Amino acid sequence: MIRTKRFMAVREKDYLAVEQTLMCGLTIDSINALGGMNENKLLSYKSLMASATDRIEDFDIDRCIVVDDFEMPVMAESDFIDYTDYSITRKTSETIIAETDGWGMCCKPGFKTQIVRAPWIKGLVSYFDFRGWLKEYCPADDWTVIDIYGKEWKILEDDIQYILTKSMFKLHKFYPSWLCYKSNFKSYGCYFGCCKVEEDYIPKARINYQMLQSLSDMTDNEIERLIAKTADEIDSVGRDYQTTMRLLGATEYNQTKSAMQEALTIYPELFKDVYNRELLKQTKKSLVKQAKGGRLRINGKYLFISPDPVAFCEWLFKGEQFPTGILENGEVYTNQFKDGDELDCLRSPHLYQEHAVRINKRNELTDKWLGGTKCVYFSCHDMISRILQQDFDGDISLVVKDRTLTTVAKRNMQGIVPLSYDLKKARGGIIDADRLYEGVSTAYTGGSIGPISNAISKVKNANGGKMTDEQIKVIAWLTMKNNQIIDFAKTLWKSEPPKEIADIIKKYTKSKLPNFFIYAKDKDPDTQVEPPNNSTMNRISAKIPASRILYNNKIGKLDWTMLINKSVDYTTRENSPIIERYNWWIWNQHRFDYGDDPHINEDDLYKYRCIAQDIVEYSNEPLDVVVNSLVAYLYTVKKSSNKKMLWACFGWTIVENLRINTAQLNPICPICGKRFKPRDVCQHYCSEECYKKADNQRRTESREAPPVRTGDMLKQ
């Protein structure tokens, strides 16, 4: 919360009622008795159970153990930055890679990869059938492990389903044993929660300007190819049914649809209404702005990052200090793309040159052991985690298959090696009120990473985007500085560059922001940005087209009576209590002022529930009469282009009316949106043309990501 300038306070008596649940039996005194700890780490870890989590109902703490982390030495080059004098030295050395930092595994069939939270525990747990692997690769004598406290566990006999690692268990040293933690966990009503679960369907993603501005020598032809999908998407808004529905979130894959999104899937004729046409105009305008700011449609997906679980099991169960694993150096695995695909693995924030181009390894063996999730798996022999500056506690990578992007990325990564530098450890010590106050107040004033990120953008877009050795050094220094500030809340330390280094940095960062920040960050074009130059991102921004919106002419005519309960009466008189109260709230909804907080979902605001309840109570009419009257008034009398409040207050009632009223209508062609009368129950498309288009889409998807070969398929 410190990094987002937020502060959460709890009434003391309420906090004391749940303190032992949050702290799983520990107290400040018991922590101090064992030497204490860093005060800001304590506050951070105490808030784990206060984060937005869903309870994992079937989690059994008795089926869970914690083992040591797997580390692997990798010989590789790196550019070492000495924070005392900011000198940069390229060296080849053995680097210890924390291969399981923040990661654990579960063997329960059907388990979905998810980020978990529990008292003092956080990280990513991904599915891996370690029991099946044990039976296939290890004799029964190896089916035991030693936990971090020295206790032996028999995996099958003890019915172990979850194996967590020490790095996930933040306060492990304050418990004498795992049995003690489990006892407290049960006694104080603790539970495991998850805050992000791997989706069944992962949509195509968009790349961002940080990743693109690193590719400083991109040619105009390469830019044209890279923006082609985005330009086509912009041109298709309104005209192409599938594109329009996807951009508005009205798809079967959206599990959290708003009432309007659900209504559009049932009754696309709503596109004919002036309100939805205005939504489309704003959607297209936003799409153009985002594209000019670097958010381009790309053949890529955001995937959880997982280590190689086979290598971990070889180390954990077989005792191999240098396991082979299932992936070699330079290989990754994901079932979202096919074998042999060249993939650019990216991660945000993208500050230095974090393009890791790797080969996807898919065969019967990797599909069998890794195909149970949609993660991207990294090899234990690879320095990729140092390139991306990530760990495995829930970090996400944008994994892209695009020949143009990978070609340019490989060219720009020539001569680039990972950065390395020493960071201070978090200070320890006895916890008391003064230390807590000092830690929080210092962390709040210790600086923000936003200015550093913006400074890096200035450097990368200077000189028309042509990168010099000096610019690369400046970016390296700023990247180190950024990570010092990220850790400042824990370490309360950051270095300062020597004067001559500070002068070099200032030479680049004293300028205004790059011109494309007009679109990327809403900066003022007259006072806050430089004139456009020939940097990669400025050229991308200039090439994004802005065309007039065209509308699909295959969608049928809107019948507003489909939106009402036809068995209930209504009124459209402006002096009726229903219409009068609705119009009053149109002018007075500012009474609920939530500011500009981007975390608030406008379609689920408390204010709309209050307004809906007030209109019903004020009018003293049944809900269906209220909804019918407002629909009739806004769709026939006032014909408003702004029906946001109607749909936010009463949208789900309208959706239920649509479900009833459209039940006997002809089906909708999923390609063009036209209603058609099918010849038989097997006809799903209105024409041969739409059928062929759908077939081509299926073939393309199958080519990009063949199905996982498991079970009986492996025997064929």
Placement of each model-derived feature along the sequence:
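Beta-strand-enriched accessory nucleic-acid recognition/scaffold domains that flank the catalytic cores
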Residues: 1-389, 395-396, 402-674, 679, ...
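Cys/His-rich microdomains that often coordinate metals
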Residues: 676-677, 690, 694
